[in-house]
């Protein structure tokens, strides 16, 4: 019975499309080719929105004592995130990063479940492509669980969000453990939490699989799902947005095993790129293929020093600006320090401060941002 409820919960939205327009049906079956700007009936799965409200502490339906306590805690934490991270970033973005508002499609490799900062820095995107090693995850019906299990899940979810809320990034080692549990089983959970807290409505969530031509098909086998597609929109907007999350190894060897993703990326054409707390993987030879896609297909790139090394950026971008401070890397990544990048930060009178701290250099009270633009495309 629970299995039946789960299938109805996850795929009820598919049945809803049978009574929609032919355009909506076509888009449902081949979601990677859906144009967010096309005016077509929005397909809703109310259970997906209800789940998003519940895990984000915004539901008015659960009045249990345990949930009300979780709700109060979530509200308090969110207020701190807004005051300490979001508002300072918004002020900085609007003052110094105006071109990001022109970006409609964003690629965020090594993202984990970090929808929050992608959305804050790039507020107008219609399409968000997120990639990480962590599993995509699946939803469940909260009411199908005993109260102790629901409370255990919410406690574990809060724990998994700690580093993102406090430091501005997810720790890879923590995610490996925290997002591979029975209920908290992938990045879908932090993504949905941040979507709801950011004021978005979840229209539907579709487990999916890549096809050889780089398109996506809805997958009924959630145990083997490699990706999730989330359709969402802002209150008061008619435009529907789409988020793709892929669980893929972006190393050269990993991409050889998943050529369909490489084709998917090529099919996207030009996009903006966001990189943060990326473990300096793009500094390393085994990640040269994905680095090449980033350099070739990006119109604008916003990153910290853990992203693409400066020596590669200089050959592809017409304008490179730096913000914040860059004097060192943490000991774990000391070998990736860039003296050439430090020289760009040398004139502190000309380099604007960020007014916020996110990323690896928390212990030094430093944040660095690199903003690169191809003038011919913006």
Predicted features and spans:
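Active-site/pore-lining binding-face segments in mid-to-C-terminal subdomains
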Residues: 196-261
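Sec-dependent N-terminal signal peptides
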Residues: 4-13
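Thiamine diphosphate
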Residues: 191-193
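Non-globular targeting/processing and membrane-anchoring segments
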Residues: 23-163, 240-378
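Short, intrinsically disordered low-complexity segments
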Residues: 143-169, 214-229
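Short, thiol/selenol-centered motifs that function as redox-active sites or metal-ligating centers
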Residues: 111-122, 129, 167-189
